[in-house]
Amino acid sequence: MEEPQITVGILSGKEIEFSFPESFTTPDGTKVSGAQKAVYQKEKIYWSGKEYDELIFYPQPNAGIFFELKDVTIGINFHWERKEVQRFQGALKIIVEGETLTAINVISIEDYLTSVISSEMSATASLELLKAHAVISRSWLINKLRVENEKWKATIQPDSAANSPHSTLHSQLIKWYDHEAHTHFDVCADDHCQRYQGITRASTPQAIEAVSATRGEVLMYEGKICDARFSKCCGGAMEEFQNCWENVRHPYLTGKRDYIPESHASDSEKQITGPAIQLPDLTQEEEADRWIRTSPDAFCNTQDKKILSQV
């Protein structure tokens, strides 16, 4: 059975520079190698002396073959934002979007996930951490593809979300920025979706094993794949889904402390948890101020250098 493929939007611009260290082929069988440049001209793609509506380049069936893209922006809107040359496996597709060109990587889901867990966290992390990340990332991705295939779109109703018992935003404008904004590819390559940097960041045997060992595994709730959006650090508290993303309530994504109370912990969990402290009412200014200015116990509040080196 052929492995499912997805499309990942990598970069956009008036010009896109790319290269093929080894030969790629176009749909008509033309072999292409070396440095290339595609330019936007009057709603067309200008490449190799001709105009096109769309370009696609397929790799030869050789293990390890890749293409390179110049000036890929990583860390968009973060203090460490920068451009770099990145390498990708799979096919390269170039389309016209508005008055720019967009480079899209066509890649298998499992190869995509190997890159994601190597880009989002250290590829040298322990196997169990990488396996957990693989399951979460696969769940988020497949849930997103399922939603789009069913042509489901959330109707955003800010007033309804503001009426959540955990929200005081009754008179403020609420706006969600979601991955559904992408119309010509499945996901983007930055933190807006999941960080994906192709094979630029070296994967490791344990990253490959983590994806392989969990192949097909996803998080489920009442027979449906979970929308498993994740963050690297939660500040000790998890917000309700509808207050951050779409005006949809998910019972499995609720506001609570990033902590297991001792009374509910297993024997092994009790060894890593402190006193059973519940999440305070952060809608109260005094409680929120105390929470922000102190360092409350939380899973992501750790000084363990071994753990910190892996995430």
Language-model-detected regions and their locations in the chain:
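Conserved, single-site charged/polar hotspot
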Residues: 1-311
